[in-house]
Amino acid sequence: MNAPDKTGTDRRAVPAAVDLDALIRAEHRDPFSILGPHDDGKGGQYVRAYLPAALSVRLLARDDGRELAELHMSDVPGFFVGHLEQPQPYLLKINWAGGEQITEDPYSYGPLLGEMDLYLFAEGNHRDLSSCLGAQVTSVDGVEGVRFAVWAPNARRVSVVGSFNGWDGRRHPMRLRHPTGVWEIFVPRLQPGEVYKYEILGAHGILPLKSDPMALATTLPPDTASKISAPLKFEWHDQDWLQSRAGRHDVAAPLSIYELHAGSWQMEQNDEGQWRQYNWRELADRLIPYVKELGFTHIELMPIMEHPFGGSWGYQLLAQFAPTARYGSPEDFAAFVDACHQAEIGVILDWVPAHFPTDTHGLAQFDGTALYEYADPKEGFHQDWDTLIYNLGRTEVHGFMLASALHWLKHYHIDGLRVDAVASMLYRDYSRKAGEWVPNRFGGRENLEAIDFLRHLNDVVALEAPGTMVIAEESTAWPGVSESTQKGGLGFNYKWNMGWMHDSLQYMEEDPINREHHHGKLSFSLVYAWSERFVLPISHDEVVHGKHSLIDKMPGDRWQKFANLRAYLAFMWTHPGKKLLFMGCEFGQWREWNHDEQLDWYLMQYAEHVGVKKLVGDLNRIYREEKALHQRDADPTGFQWLIGDDKSNSVFAYLRWSNDGEPLLVVANMTPVPREGYRVGVPLQGAWTELLNSDAETYAGSNIGNGGEVISEDEPVHGMSASLTLNLPPLAVLIFKPKKG
């Protein structure tokens, strides 16, 4: 016969000393084997609970609340044991010093995650991971609560902690699901809005509290806790947009992107002179009419995933599934996207699968080992940014990032992702000297795991989120970035044309008197313009860190700077390739961009700045309306040089062709010297309408031009049967279209 202990409890009800000692020290790997209900071998159950600081615990019937039994405190303070004559659902009635609590027992529930979920996660191919891991508001056996699940295969113990348990890691140690390394627990009666973290015991002791890698919401930085969030419940009104999206994203369609930083586009100043960032709904009210007025087809948001340091602009993020709390709730962000779609504006997100910051509350050494990153710093540490590199060769990390992409595209109706820093992913020796990198298994410099990930990403996105886009920021000559994976490419829809950007800006920065010596910098991009499907990017990177604003890059006096800027934008909009322009460039902001301050909207009281903005609006309108400027972007037959070698005058002339054979003529004069009587060949006789003159008075130019129309002459030149005699304004671009009828 088993004698009772001094509390009157059958000693069989108390775990072995070694188990109890491990539980008390918060080191037990399987708390469910000790806590909760366990058969007594006679048809009844022992019930055990470890509730440090509890004064007393009783069991109540779940159905009617009657008292079933008292749990007696054992020799170990906080460890309570009791007995039920027969198994039945019960509640814990806990008496604390601060009051009474009635709740279900977290340790009365069996395994929660399905075997298929765990299998797909381990395989790296769970397409809806954000509805599986993390904090999931759910119901188990009719009880509302939150299921927590986190991947930490090398941890000795994982607990979920928060204000609901006094941030005490002894209260809710989790169950390890072998062999995937996922830990789980259901905490009854928890509500959305509660904050939490994970307390992880690694091989060498307790780690700093960790935020949830799968968090759907977060607290406002500098706080670093995760926040329980119910599944996104938002009534979308964008079905018309979603149905038309694939056509809008076709390579033959116009694509004009306004890049912005949500927090610094525009702010509100209070009576004390303090600046406040707008939330998503306020931003939508102000931004959408502005973007519509300018005629952009899409906006591109710099990363809006939660990030600890605002000065990283979002590129050093730690919550791949949670919109930052800086601008509101997940529902607020969904409302912003929905409002954009109803206004026929697409939304592209910058997305960062290349690296993550070293903050101790984040992914670094998540379970005490290099889990998300490479263990070897020669593979896993990015020297340029002092960040860690995702180990995309690990199936779980591969699947984690894949699920992040799908989360934004499917749950938030995002129209495209711009993948940041692709070049750093493709090469193991990126920005590294000899001896500072590890070759791949074939001895080469290519990062085979990242290449496999990018190809898989693009294939899966095409399948799971048809009609969306994935755009690469890739700065090297890697072949086939926008070629299909079936043909050996990486499978992106578009690639940023960094070569065009660097060469064209270097040309524009030259004093016009020297441009004849750099003529090829403006024309060389047409040698490779069809090697990829390109976006022409004038992004945030070009207006920070001492590079000067776009207008301040331009040479000359004030008038020439504005004229150069207008000419450059007109050249960009008529050059093959989709368009991207960073906020502030559309009206010629003088200052470099500062993420802590709003744009210099006061400049809109000056005619020159208004003129640049009006030009951008007209360029976008003409770009959308004139098929020749977008239909054959990816086809070399859509572009034809007329004059590419007039170095002495710095004049360029070319035709753009539509699918039905309609041409547009573009003539650029990149010097401040007007050219009168300048002859340019054209393929059609008759009248040619001057669609745009970047020197027009309406843009605050000098208004030198051709009176809106020019009649061709029967004088062949430049391989054409007819020609136009033009007045070329200084530092200006002209666009002509043959007049019908």
Curated annotation (Swiss-Prot):
EC number(s) recorded for this UniProt protein: 2.4.1.18
Active site: residue positions: D420 (nucleophile), E473 (proton donor)
Keyword Glycosyltransferase: yes
Domain of life from the UniProt record: Bacteria
GO biological process terms, semicolon-separated: glycogen biosynthetic process
CDD domains noted in UniProt: AmyAc_Glg_BE, E_set_GBE_prok_N
GO molecular function: 1,4-alpha-glucan branching enzyme activity; cation binding; hydrolase activity, hydrolyzing O-glycosyl compounds
Catalytic activity: Transfers a segment of a (1->4)-alpha-D-glucan chain to a primary hydroxy group in a similar glucan chain
Pathway involvement of the protein, from the record: Glycan biosynthesis; glycogen biosynthesis
Record carries keyword Glycosyltransferase: yes
SMART domains, per database record: Aamy
Entry GO CC: cytosol
Keywords per UniProt: Carbohydrate metabolism, Glycogen biosynthesis, Glycogen metabolism, Glycosyltransferase, Transferase
Any Pfam family the entry gives: Alpha-amylase
Assigned protein family: Belongs to the glycosyl hydrolase 13 family. GlgB subfamily.
Function: Catalyzes the formation of the alpha-1,6-glucosidic linkages in glycogen by scission of a 1,4-alpha-linked oligosaccharide from growing alpha-1,4-glucan chains and the subsequent attachment of the oligosaccharide to the alpha-1,6 position.
Subunit structure: Monomer.
Protein's name in the database: 1,4-alpha-glucan branching enzyme GlgB
